């Protein structure tokens, strides 16, 4: 009888331990583990697909472009990224070197890239009459500032 009781207790303990271990929860902290994401979670141990990204571009031109635009009759420029206005400025305003994203009076656009780390946008620059001086495709990358210079080449309306 004592032997049967010992066997019963032994199997009961094995059953309880097996049940307890099978119900053990995964205690890993889930979140965004990519440092390029603005939703990065430094305490996350497992990526859960929640990473979201942003990238920026600053569009600028120098004195040569300003002089050419003014000589061509352009007094103001409007900047579009994929059809959306991101800024405007007088053609007499120019930079002697590339500005940083967000610099005062710069044409800076911060774009939501959603769950991708790079996205292509169409840049269009038009004057006050709607004449398009520049059009190109820009690839904006996550967690970066693209400094894009508009280069002047003689154009006639």
Predicted feature residues:
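Bacterial N-terminal signal peptides that target proteins for export
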Residues: 1-9
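Bacterial Sec-dependent N-terminal signal peptides
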Residues: 3, 15-57
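Short, ordered, surface-exposed loop/turn motifs in non-cytosolic proteins
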Residues: 46, 66-92
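Exposed beta-strand and adjacent loop surfaces of beta-rich binding modules
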Residues: 56, 74-76, 118-122
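A short, amphipathic beta-strand motif
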Residues: 57-65
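Short, acidic Ser/Thr/Gly-rich low-complexity loop/linker segments typical of extracellular
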Residues: 84-108
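A short, solvent-exposed beta-strand micro-motif common in secreted/extracellular proteins
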Residues: 105-131
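Structured interaction patches on ligand/partner-binding surfaces of diverse proteins
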Residues: 124-157
């Amino acid at each position: 009888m004592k032997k049967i009781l010992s066997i019963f207790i032994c199997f009961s303990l094995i059953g309880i331990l097996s049940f307890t271990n099978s119900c053990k929860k995964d205690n890993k902290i889930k979140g965004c583990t990519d440092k390029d994401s603005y939703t990065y979670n430094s305490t996350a141990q497992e990526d859960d697909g929640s990473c979201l990204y942003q990238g920026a571009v600053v569009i600028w031109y120098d004195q040569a472009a300003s002089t050419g635009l003014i000589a061509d009759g352009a007094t103001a420029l409007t900047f579009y990224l994929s059809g959306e206005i991101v800024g405007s400025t007088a053609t007499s305003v120019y930079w002697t070197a590339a500005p940083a994203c967000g610099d005062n009076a710069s044409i800076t656009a911060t774009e939501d890239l959603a769950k991708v780390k790079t996205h292509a946008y169409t840049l269009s620059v038009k004057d006050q009459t709607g004449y398009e001086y520049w059009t190109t495709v820009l690839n904006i990358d996550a967690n970066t500032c693209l400094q894009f210079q508009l280069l002047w080449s003689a154009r006639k309306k």
